[in-house]
A protein has these predicted regions:
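HKD-type phospholipase D/PLD-like phosphodiesterase module
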Residues: 3-31, 41-140
């Protein structure tokens, strides 16, 4: 699409969830240099796993993958995140991480003003050229 319209930008609406998911997987497969990914919620379900595998395959091809997740929705995912972050071409960062990993509610009780700041971004960018943005998080 970019090659067909050099020097121009454009917008294309992805109205169906399946189309939006497929577009993300295709972008991950087509990326040559970078993938910059930000999500408020990333479920560890079928869709989340398939998209994670697409990011992992891209990293295996030498693509630099940067994943930013809001920590509010990562409860129970620390081992999954650590394994992903161990890949040399993948960086995982948590937005506004909780200090008490196992007792997150404690942070809400003692530090509400800080932990209530959340990142609701939903963005999937390949090679700084194509971006999918919008209201869809990752999950079934």
């Amino acid at each position: 699409m970019v090659e067909a319209h050099p020097g121009q930008s454009g917008v294309f609406a992805l109205q169906e969830g399946l189309d939006a998911f497929a577009a993300r997987v295709l972008l991950a497969g087509a990326a040559e240099h970078t993938l910059d990914v930000q999500y408020y919620i990333w479920h560890h379900d079928m869709s989340g796993t398939l998209l994670l595998e697409a990011l992992h395959r891209a990293a295996d091809r030498g693509v630099r993958v940067r994943l930013l997740l809001d920590d509010n929705n990562t409860a129970g995912l620390d081992p999954w995140i650590a394994a992903l972050d161990a890949h040399p071409n993948i960086e995982v960062r948590l937005f506004n991480p909780f200090k008490h990993r196992r007792w997150r509610v404690l942070d809400y009780l003692v530090d509400f003003a800080r932990v209530n700041r959340r990142m609701h971004n939903k963005s999937f960018t390949a090679d700084s050229q194509l971006t999918i943005i919008g209201g869809r998080n990752v999950g079934d």
